[in-house]
Amino acid sequence: MIQIKNLKKEYRTNNTSNLVLDNINLEIKQGEIFGIIGHSGAGKSSLLRCLNLLEQPTDGSIFIADENITKKNSKQLREFRKKVAMIFQHFNLLSSRNVFENIALPLEIQGIPKSEIKKRVFELLDLVELPNKANAYPQELSGGQKQKVAIARALALNPLVLLSDEATSALDPTSTKQILALLKRLNKELGLTIVLITHEMDVVRKICDRVAIIDKGRIAEMGKTLDVFLNPQAPVTRSFVETSIHTKVPDFIAKKLQDNPYSYDNTYPVVQLTFYGDKGKMPIIAEISRQFNATASIIQANIETIQDQIVGIAICHITGERQDWENALRFLSNQDVNLKVLGYATADNI
């Protein structure tokens, strides 16, 4: 659906230049929700705006539905943009027009007959669950309702792709939840490919199939959302994941850990176990006690939801005779869970 090849974007002013996108390569599949996350200034907005050529790339190519959009002239580009819609953080509704008229605007520009416009607008109002708001003005709507109107307007010409530029950043938590649920439903019902940028990892984990993390104009990491959350590789990815799920070792534990199990007598491993899906039903902690005469004390545990998957994360201190806890670690490493040895500590120090 979308292929980005060797993309670069450089801003030049007088004698200075600023490279904001450097050799970006990625592919977005038809019908998926793809997230792009990064800190402010990382280049994510520039990348999104290149996808409809609101920003002209300095180098590289972009293919959407097998068309190289970077080669299109102005007339071809106007036609192409019907296929790629966009929604924004601040809605961009016209205050002088009511909801019906805001949604109708792109249809009017295309010269669609009024009877067809009326039918299409009310279809869209039903689709975004605002059937009774046709005559309301933007100032009479909540933030979530304004974004629903913006989404309806974006869908007026039946686009193949919807670009979302921080569409939930200005919303309260309840409205954010509603907009994300709407986007997910539109993705499934319409087969709509959605590319969204955000600085909120919570948004990514709730609706994105895959995610790319951008740092200083480059892709630092990319993969399936669940994989990225459970096993982040890049430091910037780990920092984002820690803002969304509790994977960071608490400071009061971290400062007591030793790297070497032989640093002191009677030191025992502190481990992080991550379960997801059916793996969470396995009585692994009980098995450690039953099979190896070792004790697994739970220091911290929490349950998260990532892409409709239940994920459990537990930090445990495994104590017992050295041979027993070593056997327990070997057992854990062979189970269908993620095991990470965080360090070692004495039984009375945790």
Curated annotation (Swiss-Prot):
Location within or outside the cell: Cell inner membrane
GO MF, one example: ATP binding
EC number: 7.4.2.11
EC class: translocase
Annotated transmembrane regions: none
Annotated family: Belongs to the ABC transporter superfamily. Methionine importer (TC 3.A.1.24) family.
Oligomeric and partner information: The complex is composed of two ATP-binding proteins (MetN), two transmembrane proteins (MetI) and a solute-binding protein (MetQ).
Protein name, per record: Methionine import ATP-binding protein MetN
Source organism: Francisella tularensis subsp. holarctica (strain LVS)
